[in-house]
Amino acid sequence: MVHQPPAGTRDLLPQDVTQKRWIESRLQQVFQQWGYQRIITPTLERLDTLVAGGAVQRSAVIQVQSDEESGLGLRPELTASIARAAVTRLAGSSLPLRLYYLANVFRPAFQGDRLQQRELFQAGVELLGVGGTLADAEVLHVLADALAELGFGQPPLGSWHLVVGEASLTRSLLQPFPKDLREKVRQAIAQLDRVTLESLPLESQLRDRALLLHDLRGQPDQVFAKLQQLTLTPLEQTLRDRLAQLVELYNASAGPQDSPLLLDLSLLRSFDYYTGIVFEVVYETPTGPWVLAQGGRYDRLLDVYDPQAAGQPGIGFSCNIENLQQVLLAANRLPHRPPAIDQLVIPVDSEAYGAALAEAQRLQRQDQLRVELYLDSDRRPEVVQAFAQRRRIGRIVWVSSGSAPQSEAVAVAERATTTC
């Protein structure tokens, strides 16, 4: 229908925008406290940038008609664009780079036969140019602090789960499976589909391995104990030890409102550029689990845009603003209305128009008030009072051209803009 937004998109009305800005401002405050600086990249990018050397499928990009030889598309995520900007526009900058973003991303409207939201809003950080366990722990703590700033970890929201995997370790553990079955095994493990694992045409030893990999999720000590039942290669042992160091470092430095770290070695991201830890924040609701944020380490992505980057590492995460908004709204943590207007300025007649405009500007600039100018021709006091009550305006200011403004209070039932 011509008067409706496209499938998978929606209008954000003033109340929606107020709630979205409430979330974004708190996330931004935490990002800045950790030393991250905002970056804004183009909504429209070259397709070669967006597919990240093949790590992002072209089918995941909404492509647009263009005279560009490589084609153009709408970004399905921010990491590739920021990596491209880092190795071109920020080349030579002092490392590490700490960047954050507040932006929209775009996905195809249909995933298989299922309609999904086409335009999404995200907030996130990227830490570029440094690897290691300490950098991983920093990013996890930035995420934990951001959630705490929104009220997670305290009533009425309660706890959340930080689930961490290791992409390189998981890929390596899947290598013994036949190539034609490896992806099926991976998908079954990721979807907790034990029945499929038991039905795949695998030798008994490989079936036992698949079932063990299926169970590599939960408390870290339990996962590490199960992992030791496998004969690990030197690389796998190194990755296992590095993951154990991260768990110890994160838990030792976690605050009282932070969620204990859980492990899930079946956790893989839909974008295939991750090379180290991958993680997501899961929050349980009466309707099921919601993923509020996700991210991971990508130590070869920057090489795609500059071969001279020589393995420059990176790690980051993105928060799903829509999911956060739904969870916070259900917990009564968000503003229910846009901010109320403080004063309504009414010219008593046409000769007072100039004086009314001047008074409105004085209140805005000098007193830092939210001011609305009354534009209706019906200026009867009872009509103006009713108008102010409907719009939750606290005071009325009558302005005439030859005398001082006269102010009176309005009986407004509720002017609170948030329950927080």
Curated annotation (Swiss-Prot):
CDD domains: HisRS-like_core. Heteromultimer composed of HisG and HisZ subunits. The gene is hisZ. Gene3D superfamilies: Bira Bifunctional Protein, Domain 2. SUPFAM superfamilies: Class II aaRS and biotin synthetases (SSF55681). Required for the first step of histidine biosynthesis. May allow the feedback regulation of ATP phosphoribosyltransferase activity by histidine. GO terms for biological process: histidyl-tRNA aminoacylation; L-histidine biosynthetic process. This function is generally fulfilled by the C-terminal part of HisG, which is missing in some bacteria such as this one. Its main location: cytoplasm. InterPro entries: aa-tRNA-synth_II, aa-tRNA-synth_II/BPL/LPL, HisRS-like_core, HisRS/HisZ, HisZ. This is ATP phosphoribosyltransferase regulatory subunit. It is found in: Cytoplasm. GO terms for cellular component: cytoplasm.
